[in-house]
Amino acid sequence: SIDLIFGLPGQNLESWKKQVDKAMTLDVQHISAYGLIYEKNTPLWRQMKSGKVIPADDETALEMYDYLVETCAGNGFEQYEISNFAQSGQESLHNIVYWNYLPYMGFGSAACSFDGQRRRTNAETIEDYLKGSAPSLEEIATRTGFAEAMFLGLRKTDGVDLMEIKRRFGIDACEFLAAESASFIKKGLLRLDGKKRRLSLTEHGMKFGNEI
C-alpha cells in the first residue's frame, strides 16, 4: 500500500502523471491519494500566506485527481472511497470501520476511541499519558452522530445505507435532508437509489465531496 499527495507547491500535471504512472509499476494492491491541505497556523500555511509557496490552482488539482481515477481504473484498481483505490479484496478494513461509523479503539497519547455513543481521547502529551491522566469524554448527540455517519459514509463509492441510518439514529435522511439532497441530485453530485435505499456521490460529486 502506498500514499500519494497531489497539489504540492510547484507540482504540475505532467510531474503528477509521472508519479502515478510510476506507482502503477510497483507491486502494490492499495493506493491512497490526498490533495494537499494547508491547515491553518501550520508552518506550510504560514509560508503560503506569506507567498513563499504557491499552492496548485483548483483546476490543476481536479485534473490531477481525474488522471489518478482514470489510471487506477485502467490498471485494475477499484475506487471504493473518495481517496482510496484497491485491487479486488485489498480494501483497507481499518479505514472502512471509520467510514461505516463503527466502534474502534485507540491506544497511546492523543489517541481516540469510539464506542458508537461516545468518544474518548487520551491525554495529548506522552508525559501526561504515562502519568495516567484521565481521558476526555464526549457524548455524541443523536443529531451529531447522524451527521457524522452521513458525511463519513458518503465518502464511500457505494454511499450510505439509509435504512441502516434510520435504524441507528431514528432519522429519515431523505426527509431530514430533503432540500439539500434534492439540490445536489439536480446538480448531478448526488445519486439516490430508491430501490436499494442508498444515497451516494456521483463520479462528478466525488471531486467535491468535502464541499457536499
Model-flagged regions — what are they?
Residues 1-171:
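C-terminal scaffold of the Radical SAM
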Residues 81, 185-196:
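A short, conserved structural fragment
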Residues 162-163, 175, 192:
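Extended hydrophobic-aromatic, low-complexity segments
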Residues 171-186:
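Short amphipathic alpha-helical interaction segments
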Residues 197-202:
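Minor-groove-contacting beta-hairpin "wing" of winged helix-turn-helix DNA-binding domains
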Residues 204-212:
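Short, amphipathic alpha-helical interaction segments positioned at domain boundaries
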